[in-house]
Amino acid sequence: MQKLIMGNWKMNGSSASIKELCKGISEVNYNSEKVAVAVFPSSVYVKEVLAQLPKEIGVGLQNITFYDNGAYTGELSAEMLHDVGCNYLLIGHSERRSLFGETDQDVFKKLNKIIDTSVVPVVCIGESLEDRQGGRLEKVLTTQLSLILENLSIEQLARVIIAYEPVWAIGTGVVASLEQVQETHQFIRSLVAKVDENLAKNMKIVYGGSLKAENAKDILSLPDVDGGLIGGASLKASEFNEIINQANKICTE
């Protein structure tokens, strides 16, 4: 299966630094049939990034609202996402959930806004350290995915990418063990298999949580890991490019 390497730039960057970052990422060599690459800049820089990156690198928004338009100051709509030329969308990132109170219902409503379009939805799920230590991992992930798996058709679900990000490993430098990553990805795939086994086999499930160049090979080589959602390491072209290179090697060996 093609690996998917994505960079979530979060609320970082300036026109100058993003120009330098795009220049660096543009220099990476990889087989685009084996590896897909996408980045999620801050929305104010999307047009700049689209203009500066090669066309084969996807560009997405980090969030949208589920409202169509109107008096919702500060929000971005699905129509705006299309209008600026984005082809990816992050939905339900743990920071959206924890800092802004985003719920599973909100995630589902946002997904519904773009599920029948050409935009690739990346739905983020993950547990807190308390949930994992309390033995609630499977319950939490099942709940986070239930609305999506129960209400979308197989054809719609086939467009969805799931990003597993243990909340306790995001931006902390703490990385889940290889066993934890594989077991959790395998569990997520088993949830999808209850809907359709072929869907589960082909659905991309990527890992996010302090993924960096030094651990990329081991994590991306796991049988149920189809790529990565990279945070801090994606802000350095050399490191992000090395992760892309590692994915490319895995897919071509």
Curated annotation (Swiss-Prot):
The keyword Isomerase applies. It comes from Francisella philomiragia subsp. philomiragia (strain ATCC 25017 / CCUG 19701 / FSC 153 / O#319-036). Involved in the gluconeogenesis. Catalyzes stereospecifically the conversion of dihydroxyacetone phosphate (DHAP) to D-glyceraldehyde-3-phosphate (G3P). Pathway: Carbohydrate biosynthesis; gluconeogenesis; Carbohydrate degradation; glycolysis; D-glyceraldehyde 3-phosphate from glycerone phosphate: step 1/1. The gene is tpiA. Keywords: Cytoplasm, Gluconeogenesis, Glycolysis, Isomerase. Signal peptide: none annotated. This is Triosephosphate isomerase. It catalyses: D-glyceraldehyde 3-phosphate = dihydroxyacetone phosphate. The active site is at 93 (electrophile), 165 (proton acceptor). Its main location: cytoplasm. HAMAP family: TIM_B (MF_00147_B). Transmembrane segments: none annotated. Substrate binds at residues 8-10, 171, 210, 231-232. Homodimer. One of its GO terms (biological process) is gluconeogenesis. It is found in: Cytoplasm. GO terms for cellular component: cytosol. One of its GO terms (molecular function) is triose-phosphate isomerase activity. Its EC number is 5.3.1.1.
